[in-house]
Amino acid sequence: MVITLPKLKYALNALSPHISEETLNFHYNKHHAGYVNKLNTLIKDTPFAEKSLLDIVKESSGAIFNNAAQIWNHTFYWDSMGPDCGGEPHGGIKEKIQEDFGSFNNFKEQFSNILCGHFGSGWGWLALNNNNKLVILQTHDAGNPIKDNTGIPILTCDIWEHAYCIDYRNDRASYVKAWWNLVNWNFANENLKKAMQK
C-alpha cells in the first residue's frame, strides 16, 4: 500500500492573512510531502508496506513512526482549520468545552498557554480522554494522543517552527493568536460526536 499525500480541502491562499500562501505551500508541498516520500522509502519491502497509515502510527517506532505520525498529524492539522472558520464554537463542542473548562475563554487561555509555553517542536491537542472529558495535551516532535493512548484527538495546532516562521519569525504567540481565526469547529464537532460514541 503506497502512502499518498492527502489533498488539501482548500486553496493554498485560503487561510490568508492568518497563514500565508507561501507558508502553506512550503508546509504542505515540502514538509508534509517530504514525510510521505520518506515513509514510502522506509516501509518498502517491510511488513508496514501493507498496513494503513493509522496502523503504522500505532505499531511503529523510530524513523518509521516519526514520518508516519507527522503525515497523520499534519492531515489532522489541515482539517482543524479552514477559511471562514474561527470565532466562537457552536453545537456539541461548545457545550462540552463549557462543561469541562467552565467557559470557552478559559479553554482558549489554557490552550494558548500550552501552545506558547511548549519547549521546542511539537503539537497541542484538544482530546477526549478515557473518562469522556475534554483535555488539553501537548506532544513533542511527532507524538500524538493515538500513539500515547491519552485520548481521541478533536483538534490540533502545529507548533513546529516551520508552521509559522515565514509569517511570524520566532513570534509563536502571534501565530497562536492568528490560529484561533481559523479553527474549524465543524470538524471538532464531527470528531467529538464520533469519540463520544466509542
Swiss-Prot record:
Subunit structure: Homodimer.
E.C. code: 1.15.1.1
Binding site for Fe cation: 27, 74, 158, 162
Official protein name in the record: Superoxide dismutase [Fe]
Free-text remark on how the cofactor is bound: Binds 1 Fe cation per subunit.
Entry-linked InterPro entries: Mn/Fe_SOD, Mn/Fe_SOD_C, Mn/Fe_SOD_N, Mn/Fe_SOD_N_sf, SOD_C_sf
Keyword Cell wall biogenesis/degradation included in the entry's annotation: no
Cofactor: Fe cation
Tagged with keyword Secreted: no
Family: Belongs to the iron/manganese superoxide dismutase family.
Catalysed reactions listed for this entry: 2 superoxide + 2 H(+) = H2O2 + O2
Main location: cytoplasm
Compartments where found: Cytoplasm
GO terms for cellular component: cytoplasm
